[in-house]
């Protein structure tokens, strides 16, 4: 066969290859943005006391957004500026049925702030924690952070305790705090 008799590449094949390439690159970009490739770093530290204003919730941890919305409405009626949104997760979802999971959802406040109407105030005492920070999707972060925290506890001779505290900063970083003991 001579070179003159070869047919030009099929335009449909080229388009399919280009679309496949763009889909792979696009999917990789989305996964990168969500944090799937972001490493989790664990540190051991002692926290300060937190003043926590919250609404109690029972049910799936994946359904906390509506409780955050309710807490946002309560806080918006005041002149209080929270330090950060937060959720205190009281139960282990691998041991407790989803509908019975207990949490407290609200805000970390300055110690001099008054109690916002519609919210309950609790002081979270200083404690020794393993802390993981994650910048990306809270769903992916939750999975990656708690897996890494549990592995770190085992590797370093600590026992993880509850309640876990998740602090959601305005810049998209989530800090996952898990109390630990020997």
Language-model regions: role of each:
Residues 2-182:
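A solvent-exposed interaction/effector surface
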